[in-house]
Regions:
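A short, charge-rich alpha-helical start-of-domain segment used by transcription regulators
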Residues: 8-31, 35
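Residue-level preference for hydrophobic side chains embedded in well-ordered alpha helices
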Residues: 21, 25, 29, 50, ...
């Protein structure tokens, strides 16, 4: 079934098209949901809600001529997942209480004592576990900017906060992720038999 047939079939409520859409995208989006969520339970709730919302918005793809269908589905899913996480008020709260000042040079290095870890060349289970350990605001910002390649302006708009707050949160997320990965690597190396 071609992409056009898939989209058309989904509009017509065709069960075969719906099943193919589900089979094609569900596992990809499930992993994205895991990255944005703190655990499997929250991920499942976000996945089910966001997946159904993406499915209901497929008709909006027609006007999106510069984006591939896969990217459209992924970006819409991320948008709904982020909004779901933001909707958990007892967990997600970001407030900018200090006016950020932009410096042209850094006078410190968060990673002075350790090698910076490339997130694309690390064990994905270890990375997922470490990302899920971040506080929600850091988890969202890190996923948006580093893994999903959103621009600073896009992340700022989606999270409804200033670009300076996003930069600050990203720096904290990188630091905390680095430390979490280092700790998880130490734990896993101690657990392996010699």
């Amino acid at each position: 079934m071609s992409q056009a047939e898939l989209i058309s079939g989904c509009f017509k409520n065709d069960k075969t098209a719906k099943k193919q859409f589900f089979d094609t995208y569900f596992s990809k989006l499930a992993y994205i949901s895991l990255r944005y969520s703190k655990n499997a339970v929250q991920s499942e709730q976000a996945l089910l809600q966001s997946f159904s919302q993406v499915f209901s918005k497929l008709n909006a793809f027609k006007s999106q001529s510069t984006v591939t269908f896969d990217d459209f589905v992924k970006n819409e899913f991320i948008f709904y997942t982020v909004n779901y996480i933001k909707g958990i008020r007892n967990e997600y709260y970001v407030a900018s209480t200090v006016k950020a000042v932009e410096y042209t040079e850094k006078t410190y290095d968060l990673f002075l004592d350790s090698k910076f870890i490339d997130v694309h060349n690390i064990n994905q289970d270890l990375l997922l576990k470490s990302i899920q350990a971040l506080v929600p605001s850091q988890r969202l910002v890190f996923n948006l900017l580093v893994i999903d390649n959103f621009t600073l302006a896009q992340a700022s708009e989606l999270l409804d906060t200033s670009e300076q707050s996003i930069k600050s949160t990203l720096e904290k997320a990188r630091f905390n992720l680095q430390k979490s990965i280092e700790n998880n690597l130490k734990i896993s190396s101690n657990e392996q038999p010699v």
